C-alpha cells in the first residue's frame, strides 16, 4: 500500500511520494517538449505555436531552476533542439559544436542577460544586432576554398548531410573568391540560415495547390522541407535563399571580431545580411530591437526576433557556452502576431488514448505569413474559460505554427446569432458515452478503446512512430487502409501481415493486381521492427503516460516484458523516471484481456520481448549509480548511458549520496557543483573510459 493511501503515513513516506510526483511532473513536461521538438526538427510539421512551445520550455527551465536535482544531461534544456532524432540522411559531424540560442521575450529578460554579460566584459562592449531569420540552420565546410560539405544542425554535434541539395542554392558558392586582403583559409566552417522570401513562399504554395498537393504551413516549414528533400532536383526547383550568421572551426583564419569575419565572408562570395548592425552598449541594442519590432514586415523574409551577440571573439571565449547555447549571444523574440476571424464551428477529435479534444474551425485568415483555419481548444473547460461562442469573431495568435491559439472573442461584434458549444456526450466516431478517466479530470475520453475507429487508427499509426517501432511505410493513410479493408482488427495483427493480406487493400495493390513496391517495403520493415529493443515495444503499446524515457527506464531495470508484468506497482514506481502515476498506469494496462492479447500476438509473431545482454562486455559497474553531466567528445548522451547500463551500472539523472561517480564533460553545470559539495568522485572523460574498462579500481581522472 502506498503512503498516499495510509492515513498515518509518516513524514519520510510523504516526502518520498512528493519527490516521485515531482519527478513525474518533470518527466511528463520533458517528454512533451521532446515530442514537439521532434515534430519541429524532424517532421517539419509543428502542432503548437512557437510561443506555446516557448512557454512549455520555460516551464521546464523554471522547474529545473527550482529543483536542480531534476536537471539531467538528457533534459531538453541541456541539449540542442534536434538532439537524439534519427533521420534518413547520412550523419555529418560538425567540426565545431553548432549550438542553439537562448531566448528572451521582454526587456526585463534582456536586461537580466545583459547584466550577466556586463559583469564579465564591462558596459562599453560592442554588440552585433542581427535579424533572426525563421528558417533552417545550415553549416557549410570549405576546404582550400572549395565546398566540401553542408549539414543541418542536428544535435549540435552531428547533423544531416545535405550537400547535394545545398549545392543547388544560388547563395551557396562552390568555390570561395580569394583576394589579397582575404585569401581563402585552409578550412572554413560557416553557419547560416536557409529560408524562403515571403513572395517566393506564396508562389511555391500556389504551385503546390495547382498540382493538387498540400501547401506548406509557413515559410520555415517549407524551407526545412525543401532542403531535406531526398531528390536534389526538387530542391533545385525551389527558390531557397541563405544568409550567413556565424563561423565555426577555421584553419588559416583568425578574425578578432564577428564584424571582421562577416566582411571576409562577404568578400569570399558568401551571403551576409545587409541588416546587421554593430552598436556600442545595451541602450543601442534596445533601440535596434524596438526599430525592427516596428519594421519587421519591411523586409523580404519573415523574422521572429533579433539576435544580439558580443562582437569581440576574445570576449565570446571568455564567456563560453552551456551545453546547448553560447552565453555571449541571445535571441530576443517578438510577441506572436494576432488576427481576427470568424469562428464557424467547434468540432472534436478523438486521440489514441480516447481523449476527446475540441478544436476551432474558422474562416481562413492570413496571420504571421500563412493562412490559418484551425486552432486547438484543448477541452470543454478551456472553451468555457475563453468565453468563445460558435459564430463569434475571435482573436487568434500565431507565431509561425500550423495550429494557432484562440485568445478569446470580440464581444462587441456579437449580433445575437452566436451559440454556445456543447461538448458531445457520446463519441462522434463510435457512439460510446464519454466520461472522464477519473473524477476531476478536465479531459473526457471515449472508453471504447478496443474498437473505437478513431482510437484504432491513431494506435496503429502510433506503433509505426519514430519513438515506437519506427516502421517506414506505415503512415496514417496506410493505417486507415488496413483497418477499413479488414486486413487487421487492431495493432496486434500488424506483424503477421502477408502479401495476400495487402492484396485486399487498394493502397498496396498495383493496377496489375500485384503487391506494390511500397507494400513489399512495408512487409520488410515490419520484419525488421520485430528486433527493436524492449523500450520501443513498451512505447508502441500506447500505455498512458509511458513515453520513451519511462520505457527506457523500465526496460533497463527489468530486462523483459514478463518481468515488468510480474513486478509490483511499488517495484515499478521505485524505478527512477517512473513514479507512482506511470506505475499505476502500467499495472492497470496489463489487467485488460485484449491488451494482453496484443502482446501475445506480437510475441507469437516473433517481436522481441526481452533485451539480450552482451556477454562479452564485462560487468565492471555492477550496482554502481553514475551520473554523466556536460558534453563528452567521444560519447553522445545515449552512448554514455548505454555504456554504463551494459556494464551493470545505473545511469542516474541526479546526484545524491548514493552516486558512485560523476562524469563531467564540457559545461557540466550544477551536477558537478553538487558532486563537489557531497564529496562524490568526479571523473573526466579519460577517467570514465578507465572506469568502464576496469571498474571502480580504475585510476580516477
Swiss-Prot record:
Region (Disordered): 1-21
BP GO annotations: DNA repair; DNA replication
Cofactor: Mg(2+); Mn(2+)
Gene Ontology CC, one term: cytosol
Annotated signal sequence range: none
Domain BRCT: 616-701
Class of the enzyme per the UniProt entry, highest EC level: ligase
Classification via PROSITE patterns: BRCT, DNA_LIGASE_N1, DNA_LIGASE_N2
Listed Gene3D superfamilies: 5' to 3' exonuclease, C-terminal subdomain (1.10.150.20), 6.20.10.30, BRCT domain (3.40.50.10190), DNA ligase/mRNA capping enzyme (3.30.470.30), Helix hairpin bin (1.10.287.610), Nucleic acid-binding proteins (2.40.50.140)
Record has Ligase as a keyword: yes
Catalytic function, reaction form: NAD(+) + (deoxyribonucleotide)n-3'-hydroxyl + 5'-phospho-(deoxyribonucleotide)m = (deoxyribonucleotide)n+m + AMP + beta-nicotinamide D-nucleotide
Key words, A-Z: DNA damage, DNA repair, DNA replication, Ligase, Magnesium, Manganese, Metal-binding, NAD, Zinc
Protein residues bound to Zn(2+): 427, 430, 446, 452
Described purpose of this protein according to its UniProt entry: DNA ligase that catalyzes the formation of phosphodiester linkages between 5'-phosphoryl and 3'-hydroxyl groups in double-stranded DNA using NAD as a coenzyme and as the energy source for the reaction. It is essential for DNA replication and repair of damaged DNA.
Full protein name: DNA ligase
Source organism of this protein record: Mycobacterium sp. (strain KMS)
Amino acid at each position: 500500500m502506498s503512503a498516499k493511501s495510509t492515513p498515518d503515513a509518516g513524514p519520510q513516506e510523504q516526502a518520498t511520494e512528493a519527490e516521485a510526483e515531482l519527478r513525474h511532473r518533470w518527466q511528463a513536461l520533458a517528454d512533451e517538449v521532446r515530442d514537439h521538438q521532434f515534430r519541429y526538427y524532424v517532421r517539419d510539421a509543428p502542432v503548437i505555436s512557437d510561443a506555446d512551445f516557448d512557454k512549455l520550455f520555460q516551464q521546464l527551465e523554471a522547474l529545473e531552476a527550482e529543483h536542480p536535482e531534476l536537471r539531467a544531461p538528457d533534459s531538453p534544456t541541456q541539449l540542442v533542439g534536434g538532439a537524439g532524432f534519427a533521420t534518413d540522411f547520412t550523419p555529418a559531424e560538425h567540426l565545431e559544436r553548432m549550438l542553439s540560442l537562448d531566448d528572451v521575450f521582454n526587456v526585463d529578460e534582456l536586461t537580466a542577460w545583459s547584466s550577466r554579460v556586463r559583469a564579465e566584459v564591462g558596459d562599453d562592449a560592442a554588440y552585433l544586432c542581427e535579424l533572426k531569420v525563421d528558417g533552417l540552420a545550415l553549416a557549410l565546410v570549405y576546404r582550400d576554398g572549395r565546398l566540401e560539405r553542408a549539414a543541418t544542425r542536428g544535435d549540435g554535434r552531428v547533423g544531416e548531410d545535405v550537400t547535394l541539395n545545398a549545392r543547388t542554392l544560388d547563395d551557396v558558392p562552390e568555390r570561395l573568391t580569394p583576394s589579397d586582403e582575404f585569401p581563402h583559409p585552409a578550412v572554413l566552417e560557416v553557419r547560416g540560415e536557409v529560408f524562403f522570401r515571403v513572395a517566393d513562399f506564396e508562389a511555391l504554395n500556389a504551385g503546390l495547390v495547382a498540382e493538387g498537393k498540400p501547401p506548406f504551413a509557413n515559410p520555415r516549414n517549407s524551407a526545412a522541407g525543401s532542403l531535406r528533400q531526398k531528390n536534389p532536383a526538387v530542391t533545385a526547383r525551389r527558390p531557397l535563399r541563405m544568409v550567413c550568421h556565424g563561423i565555426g572551426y577555421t584553419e588559416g583564419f583568425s578574425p578578432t571580431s564577428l564584424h571582421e569575419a562577416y566582411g571576409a565572408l562577404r568578400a569570399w562570395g558568401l551571403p551576409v545580411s545587409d541588416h546587421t548592425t554593430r552598436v556600442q552598449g545595451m541602450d543601442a541594442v534596445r533601440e535596434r530591437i524596438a526599430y525592427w519590432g516596428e519594421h519587421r514586415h519591411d523586409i523580404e523574409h519573415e523574422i521572429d526576433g533579433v539576435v544580439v551577440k558580443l562582437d569581440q571573439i576574445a570576449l565570446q571565449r571568455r564567456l563560453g557556452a552551456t551545453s546547448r547555447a553560447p552565453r555571449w549571444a541571445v535571441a530576443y523574440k517578438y510577441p506572436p502576431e494576432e488576427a481576427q476571424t470568424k469562428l464557424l464551428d467547434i468540432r472534436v477529435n478523438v486521440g489514441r488514448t480516447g481523449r476527446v479534444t475540441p478544436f476551432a474551425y474558422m474562416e481562413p485568415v492570413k496571420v504571421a505569413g500563412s493562412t490559418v483555419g484551425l486552432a486547438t481548444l484543448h477541452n470543454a473547460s478551456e472553451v468555457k474559460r475563453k468565453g468563445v461562442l460558435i459564430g463569434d469573431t475571435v482573436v487568434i495568435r500565431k507565431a509561425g505554427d500550423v495550429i494557432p491559439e484562440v485568445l478569446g472573442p470580440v464581444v462587441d461584434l456579437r449580433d445575437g446569432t452566436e451559440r454556445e458549444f456543447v461538448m458531445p456526450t457520446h463519441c462522434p466516431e463510435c457512439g460510446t458515452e464519454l466520461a472522464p478517466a477519473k473524477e476531476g479530470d478536465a479531459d473526457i475520453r471515449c472508453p471504447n478503446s478496443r474498437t473505437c475507429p478513431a482510437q484504432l487508427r491513431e494506435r496503429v499509426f502510433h506503433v509505426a512512430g519514430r519513438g515506437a517501432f519506427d516502421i517506414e511505410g506505415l503512415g496514417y493513410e496506410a493505417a486507415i487502409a488496413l483497418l477499413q479493408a479488414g486486413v487487421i482488427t487492431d495493432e496486434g495483427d500488424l506483424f503477421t501481415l502477408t502479401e495476400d493480406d495487402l492484396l485486399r487493400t487498394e493502397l498496396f495493390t498495383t493496377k496489375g493486381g500485384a503487391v506494390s513496391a511500397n507494400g513489399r517495403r512495408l512487409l520488410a520493415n515490419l520484419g525488421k521492427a520485430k528486433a527493436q529493443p524492449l523500450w520501443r515495444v513498451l512505447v508502441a503499446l500506447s500505455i498512458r503516460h509511458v513515453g520513451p524515457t519511462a520505457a527506457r527506464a523500465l526496460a533497463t531495470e527489468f530486462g523483459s516484458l514478463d518481468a515488468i508484468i510480474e513486478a509490483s506497482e511499488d517495484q515499478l514506481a521505485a524505478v527512477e523516471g517512473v513514479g507512482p502515476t506511470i506505475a499505476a498506469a502500467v499495472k492497470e494496462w496489463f489487467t485488460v484481456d485484449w491488451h494482453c492479447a496484443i502482446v501475445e500476438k506480437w510475441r507469437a509473431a516473433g517481436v522481441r520481448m526481452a533485451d539480450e545482454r552482451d556477454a562479452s562486455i564485462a560487468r565492471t559497474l555492477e550496482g554502481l549509480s553514475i551520473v554523466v553531466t556536460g558534453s563528452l567528445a567521444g560519447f553522445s548522451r545515449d552512448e554514455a548511458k548505454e555504456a554504463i547500463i551494459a556494464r551493470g551500472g545505473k545511469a542516474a539523472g541526479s546526484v545524491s549520496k548514493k552516486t558512485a561517480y560523476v562524469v563531467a564533460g564540457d559545461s557540466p553545470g550544477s551536477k558537478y557543483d553538487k558532486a563537489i559539495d557531497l564529496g562524490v568522485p568526479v571523473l573526466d572523460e579519460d577517467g570514465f573510459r578507465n572506469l568502464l574498462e576496469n571498474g571502480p579500481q580504475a585510476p580516477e581522472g
